[in-house]
Regions:
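AMP-forming adenylation/ATP pyrophosphatase catalytic core
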Residues: 21, 133-370
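Conserved small/polar residues in nucleotide/adenosyl-binding loops
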Residues: 373-375
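ATP-dependent adenylation/nucleotidyltransferase module used to activate substrates
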Residues: 1-166, 177, 187, 193
Length: 375
C-alpha cells in the first residue's frame, strides 16, 4: 500500500465493522476526523448457531445487520466480504491441528494476523483506501528517533488488546489506525448512545466465533467427523488413576470436570496425544520458569541480538511478569521469568513489553522448570 499522493483528496479508511459498539464508534471517530469511510464486515463462517439466544460472539447474521444499520446511519458505503474458505483453511483447520497436537490455540490472534490485517489491508489497497481501522483498544505510534512504528497498550487497562495484536508488521502498522486506544469503554458507549447507534448497549463478544457455546471438542468432532476416544488419566509417577473422555477435551491447568476422587485437588499437568494419556497432579506441578517461543514477530526492535529485560504475558489479560528474553535460533526466543508462572501453555501467545510498548511476541512451543535447564 502506498501513501496518499493526492493531498487534495480526503484520506480513505476501511472500517472493519463487526456489528459491535467498538467498531461502530471507531467508524464515527474516523468520519468525524475527516476520513472517507467504507464499512466492511467479514463473513467468516456459515454457522448459524452464532445467533443462538444468549450467546455473545461476532460475525453472526445479527451482527451483519447491526453493522449495516450503523453504516446506513452514518451514510457510508458498506459491504460484506465472504472469507469463509480462507477462514476455514487458516483459522479453523489450524485450531483443530493445534488441539490434536496437544496445544491450546488462540484463533482470535490468528484471525487478526491472517484475516483482519492481511485480507482487509490488501482489499483496502486494491480499492484506493489508505488505512484499515478496527475497534481494538490499543495505540499505534511512530518513534520519531528510529522511524519504527510502535504498538502500545490501550489507555483503558481493563480493555487493553495489545496482546492479540503482537503479529502486526511494520508495513501493516503504517496503514492501521486504532482510534479507541486513547479512550475508556465507558466513553465509547457514551458516544454510541449520543449517536443513537442500535448497538450502543450491545454486549461484548466473549467466545470463539465458530464455537459460541465453548464446547470446542464437540465442535471438532462435528466438523471433522472424528471421535476422540477415551484414555488413561495418569498421576505424575505414571500410575493410572482413572479414565478420561478424550485428551483433546482437557487443557493444561484444568481442575473442573476431571471426575477424579484423589483425596486432594488435582490439575491437568501434561498430555501425551500419541499415547492418549492425560497426566494430573498437584497445582505445584503447573509452575514453570522457562518458555520457548517460535513464529516470533518483533515490533519495537528489528531483531533480538542479546538478552533484554522485559515484562511478559503468557495469556490474555494476565498481569505482566518480569523476565529476561534471550535469542534462540533464527525464529525463536527463550524467556526466563523471575518467578515461576502458572500453566504457560504450548499454542498460546507469549507477548513481551517494555513499559506500555509491545516489544514483540511469539507462540509458546515448550515450557520447563528452571532446574531442568542447563544454560
Amino acid at each position: 500500500m502506498t501513501e496518499t499522493q493526492n493531498t487534495s483528496r480526503r484520506p480513505g479508511a476501511l472500517i472493519a465493522m463487526s456489528g459491535g459498539v467498538d467498531s461502530s464508534v471507531a467508524a464515527w471517530l474516523m468520519q468525524r476526523d475527516g476520513f472517507d469511510c467504507t464499512g466492511i464486515t467479514m463473513r467468516l463462517t456459515r454457522n448459524e448457531a452464532v445467533d443462538t439466544e444468549g450467546l455473545h460472539t461476532c460475525c453472526s447474521e445479527r451482527d451483519i445487520e447491526d453493522a449495516a444499520e450503523v453504516a446506513y446511519a452514518m451514510d457510508i458505503p458498506y459491504e460484506v466480504l465472504d472469507f469463509t474458505a480462507d477462514f476455514q483453511e487458516k483459522i479453523i483447520d489450524k485450531f483443530i491441528r493445534v488441539y490434536e497436537a496437544g496445544g491450546t490455540p488462540n484463533p482470535c490472534i490468528d484471525c487478526n494476523k491472517y484475516m483482519k490485517f492481511d485480507h482487509l489491508l490488501r482489499w483496502a489497497e486494491a480499492h484506493g483506501l489508505d488505512y484499515v481501522v478496527t475497534g481494538h483498544y490499543a495505540r499505534v505510534e511512530q518513534d520519531e528517533a528510529t522511524g519504527r512504528w510502535l504498538l502500545k497498550k490501550g489507555l483503558d487497562e481493563g480493555k487493553d488488546q495489545s496482546y492479540v495484536l503482537y503479529n502486526l508488521t511494520q508495513e501493516q502498522l503504517a496503514h492501521v489506525r486504532l482510534p479507541l486506544g486513547g479512550l475508556h469503554k465507558s466513553e465509547v458507549r457514551a458516544i454510541a448512545e449520543e449517536q443513537g447507534f442500535v448497538n450502543a448497549r450491545k454486549h461484548d463478544s466473549q467466545d470463539i466465533c465458530f464455537v459460541p457455546d465453548g464446547d470446542y471438542a464437540r465442535f471438532m468432532e462435528d466438523f471433522t467427523g472424528k471421535h476422540y476416544p477415551a484414555g488413561d488419566f495418569l498421576d505424575v509417577s505414571g500410575k493410572k488413576v482413572g479414565t478420561h473422555s478424550g485428551a483433546v477435551r482437557y487443557t493444561i491447568g484444568q481442575r473442573k470436570g476431571l471426575g477424579l476422587a484423589m483425596g486432594a485437588p488435582v490439575y491437568v499437568c501434561a498430555k501425551d496425544m500419541q499415547a492418549n494419556t492425560v497426566t494430573v497432579g498437584p497445582e505445584a506441578e503447573l509452575f514453570d520458569t522457562i518458555v520457548y517461543a517460535n513464529e516470533v514477530n518483533w515490533i519495537a526492535i528489528p531483531e533480538l541480538t542479546g538478552p533484554l529485560r522485559v515484562t511478559a504475558r503468557t495469556r490474555y489479560h494476565q498481569v505482566e511478569q518480569p523476565a529476561t528474553v534471550y535469542p534462540a535460533g533464527p525464529d525463536g526466543f527463550r524467556l526466563e521469568f523471575d518467578q515461576p508462572q502458572r500453566a504457560p501453555t504450548p499454542g498460546q501467545a507469549v507477548v513481551l513489553y517494555q513499559g506500555d510498548t509491545v516489544l514483540g511476541g511469539g507462540t509458546i512451543v515448550r515450557v520447563a522448570k528452571l532446574s531442568l535447564i542447563h544454560i
